[in-house]
Amino acid sequence: MSMRTEYCGLVTEHLLGQTVSLCGWVQRRRDHGGVIFIDLRDREGLVQVVCDPDRAEMFATAEGVRNEFCVQIKGLVRNRPEGTVNAGLKSGKIEVLCHELNVLNASVTPPFQLDDDNLSETTRLTHRVLDLRRPQMQHNLRLRYRVAIEARKYLDEQGFIDIETPMLTKSTPEGARDYLVPSRTNAGQFFALPQSPQLFKQLLMVANFDRYYQITKCFRDEDLRADRQPEFTQIDCETSFLGEQEIRDLFEDMIRHIFKTTIDVELDATFPVMPYSEAMARFGSDKPDLRVQLEFTELTDAMKDVDFKVFSTPANAKDGRVAALRVPKGSELSRGDIDGYTEFVRIYGAKGLAWIKVNEKAKGRDGLQSPIVKNLHDASIAAILERTGAEDGDIIFFAADRAKVVNDSLGALRLKIGHSEFGKANGLVHAGWKPLWVVDFPMFEYDDEDARYVAAHHPFTSPKDEHLEYLETDPGRCLAKAYDMVLNGWEIGGGSVRIHREEVQSKVFRALKIGAEEAQLKFGFLLDALQYGAPPHGGIAFGLDRIVTMMAGADSIRDVIAFPKTQRAQDLLTQAPSPVDERQLRELHIRLRQPEQPKA
């Protein structure tokens, strides 16, 4: 008989009366009245093994096994006794009567129980091998595998070709910091690990491969958050001879296919499309969570002449904004709740949080409860009530500051209230999946510190045709053929139509204050390629880690990556990064300089 004939979790009634050979780990060993029960676990699940003292040698071995021992058992599949069926297990109607038990490898006492749900992340990542044995982690990584497989199936059927691009490439420091790799054979020179295969996939379109994809690692040396890692995985795609709408349709269908085939979720037949300007005006975010049924109300123009300087000063500032967020039934919120929200918005740069409770709308200002009402004239109060559509029992929150602070703080408050217990109880958040496309992004953003424009996405994104003239006259007005796919407040994919003409690419470089010599030095290979009849092309990249995190309902992408880094970009399992010896540094012509210690 083979070492293993079945997976533990797949032993069911169809094997009744048969002898099976199983391999796995001891989840739990229980001694009940002279009979030993072993819950045996493998990647497919659990099966109950019964060790009877009638087989003395086998029973003696069973007495010595402990949790996480790796064992092989051979035995007979039989029905469980009446009243002992476990409906929570696929194998819950049967058990295996053990005939032979072999310890393949003993285990030291594990540092934690695998069913402990209160482990610190440090413990989990330090002992990642054991952590990965837990059913939830097994589920997450198998889900990740299925998502990747379904993406490949769809793209293969659509004529895409899987082509690998280099991991050692040229550093082009535009945006996030590169991970640099010193070259031993070219002293003083460095490769960079790719932040994306962007330029290579464009070159593949020029090279007539028409439709490309790969599921690939990308690297960014940036500060980490719950949804960021220094190395992450993209489903990276590029296609020729398709317009923006056709590209969106193609990949919208791919995401629908993946969700249906992996978790049996039917996403909307057509994803709504929202311009960037509308998303910012209504939600303060370019990745709005449409499950939350709260929106901003614009009040900037109505607050220009009020005596309340907290409102009028930003209302009259060039980059200022005054916006309101009406919360239905929000009068139920206590002063403690409001104080908590006030402290919360300070995290996002807000100086405070003004509010008005609407007790009796018909009474006008006399029916309002707020410390700010006395500072507002009748016309401004009327504008607030009319524009917000406030009703008795509502509360209205206000943000007034630079537009970015208003958008960040009030946008975060919108999500916090919507997803709170209060929000759930009052229907302010809907369940399910709410996808959309956000389009018409600004082509450039102005960097005050460097006094120049920078690319909002990357410098290879095509401007909208009707905005080409603005590249040289008014870059700030230029909109891009860029699009992000957003799902439940997460950007899961982003892409654009690319620039395919050399003269347009050169104009974009000039708008970014990248001179001809610098452009040739950094991107000469691209500019040269665009002169050889480059086709119209565009593409998109999806964050595999983010998609799987959402599907799995995980708290962090670290829960869907086998061996992730911490928020300090460290691998606690292997203790990377780590020092290297002096000989290796000499071979790379590198001398370390100790970082300066802060002055006392």
Swiss-Prot record:
Keyword Nucleotide-binding: yes
Subunit structure: Homodimer.
Residues that hold ATP according to the record: R220, D221, E222, Q229, E491, G543, L544, D545, R546
InterPro entries xrefs: Aa-tRNA-synt_II, aa-tRNA-synth_II, aa-tRNA-synth_II/BPL/LPL, Asp-tRNA-ligase_1, Asp-tRNA-ligase_1_N, Asp/Asn-tRNA-synth_IIb, AspRS_core, GAD-like_sf
Alphabetized HAMAP family for the sequence: Asp_tRNA_synth_type1
Marked site (Important for tRNA non-discrimination) residue numbers: H32, G83
Keyword Protein transport: no
Pfam families documented for this protein: GAD, tRNA-synt_2, tRNA_anti-codon
Function: Aspartyl-tRNA synthetase with relaxed tRNA specificity since it is able to aspartylate not only its cognate tRNA(Asp) but also tRNA(Asn). Reaction proceeds in two steps: L-aspartate is first activated by ATP to form Asp-AMP and then transferred to the acceptor end of tRNA(Asp/Asn).
Binding site for L-aspartate: E174, R220, H457, R498
Protein keywords: Aminoacyl-tRNA synthetase, ATP-binding, Cytoplasm, Ligase, Nucleotide-binding, Protein biosynthesis
EC number annotated for this UniProt entry: 6.1.1.23
UniProt-annotated location(s): Cytoplasm
Annotated family: Belongs to the class-II aminoacyl-tRNA synthetase family. Type 1 subfamily.
Chain intervals for the UniProt region annotation (Aspartate): 198-201
GO molecular function: aspartate-tRNA ligase activity; aspartate-tRNA(Asn) ligase activity; ATP binding; nucleic acid binding
Disulfide bonds: none
Protein name per the record: Aspartate--tRNA(Asp/Asn) ligase
